[in-house]
From Swiss-Prot:
Record keywords, A-Z: Metal-binding, Transferase, Ubl conjugation, Ubl conjugation pathway, Zinc, Zinc-finger
Its EC number(s): 2.3.2.27
Pathway it works in: Protein modification; protein ubiquitination
Native source species: Arabidopsis thaliana
Statement: the UniProt record of this protein carries the keyword Zinc-finger: yes
Biased composition (Acidic residues): 133-164, 173-182
Biological process, per Gene Ontology: protein autoubiquitination; protein ubiquitination
Name this polypeptide is given: E3 ubiquitin ligase BIG BROTHER-related
Domain of life: Eukaryota
Any one GO molecular-function label of the UniProt entry: ubiquitin-protein transferase activity
Span of zinc fingers (RING-type): 288-329
Length: 340
């Protein structure tokens, strides 16, 4: 749009790029029109302006144009920062840092405003009690109409049901209060009666618990009896010959040991003799096999039916456990001992 200056001539703004300005400056001297009008191109100044101002990108440049339409003589005017928009990549380091800082500050300010607005809205909803969980928010939109219809029918019955529930709970509370009040009245009249009432109540509770536990105990006893029968059957079916050494030891611990020795009377009825040094007749040894000690002269020994002699104390303890001879394993029977 043409503008009027103070000097008089009208000047217009023409947008040209750096390359176009360079070409214009190079070709202005060659055009016959410029030769007639006396226009001289300044190629060096135009190229310097293009390199310093914008580089390779396009920049809007205001060029004064006279009414005749020809470009005035002289250098191109410098671009104004207010009307020019330079890309971020073409800025210097300081300008780029400043632009980035401003952008981050604007983003932070916008984020703070959004946060403050959300907190204010949350505070308002908390004051109004809008934090109640609403299941309708997560339901399907198709079921909203059906839910609304059901709510309309249910709203009429809810007050009555709530009233009945309140009455039931109130009656129960009244009964409990009456029972407690009776006990408290007794407590006010006589402490001993109050203590007895409490003791009777505890006894009734304990009896109820014991009756419940007795039923469980009976079931446990029945289960144990069944298990004992099954375990006895398992022992009856077990063959000791097929057991391992560890199983035999465990069986011995469970069953116990059976005494296979002689009675004290039978042991006392065994014959005795006096040892004579150098007397080795009838299988008499010079030492006791049980204690490994030599016999002394004129020492009393116990003589078994198999003609093996031992110290009386040693053989007595042995025969209490086992009724066989330690040397030949011959059984020491009652009849044999009586005959000898």
């Amino acid at each position: 749009m043409p503008m009027e200056n103070d000097n008089g001539p009208h000047v217009g703004n023409v947008v040209v790029t750096a390359e176009q300005a360079t070409k214009i400056n190079e070709t202005d001297g060659r055009l016959p029109e410029n030769r007639q009008t006396g226009v001289v191109s300044d190629t060096g100044s135009g190229s310097e302006r293009g390199e310093q101002g914008v580089g390779e990108s396009a920049v809007a440049v205001a060029v004064p144009v006279e009414e005749s339409g020809s470009i005035s003589v002289g250098e191109l005017p410098a671009p104004r920062s207010s009307s020019a928009r330079v890309p971020f990549t073409n800025l210097s380091q300081i300008d780029a840092d400043l632009a980035l800082a401003r952008t981050l500050q604007e983003q932070e300010r916008a984020y703070m405003m959004l946060t403050m607005n959300s907190e204010i809205s949350d505070y308002g909803s908390w004051e109004t009690g809008s934090y109640v969980y609403d299941e309708d928010e997560f339901d399907d939109p198709e079921n909203e109409d059906e839910d609304d219809d059901e709510d309309e029918y249910e709203t009429d019955d809810d007050p009555q049901e709530d009233g009945l529930d309140v009455n039931v709970h109130a009656n129960e509370d009244d009964q409990e209060d009456d029972g407690n009040s009776d006990i408290e009245e007794v407590a006010y009249t006589d402490d001993e009666a109050y203590a007895r009432a409490l003791q009777e109540a505890e006894e009734r509770d304990m009896a109820a618990r014991l009756s419940a536990l007795s039923g469980l105990a009976n079931r446990v006893v029945e289960d144990l009896e069944d298990e004992s029968h099954t375990s006895q059957d398992a022992w009856d079916e077990m063959d000791p010959d097929e057991l391992s050494y560890e199983e035999l030891l465990a069986l011995g611990d469970i069953v116990g040991t059976e005494s296979r020795g002689l009675s004290a009377d039978t042991i006392a009825s065994l014959p005795s003799k006096r040892y004579k040094e150098g007397d080795n007749q009838n299988g008499t040894n010079e030492s006791c096999v049980i204690c490994r000690l030599d016999y002394e002269d004129d020492e009393d020994l116990i003589l078994l039916p198999c003609k093996h002699s031992y110290h009386s104390e040693c053989i007595n303890n042995w025969l209490k456990i086992n009724k066989v001879c330690p040397v030949c394993s011959a059984e020491v029977s009652t009849s044999t001992s009586g005959q000898s």
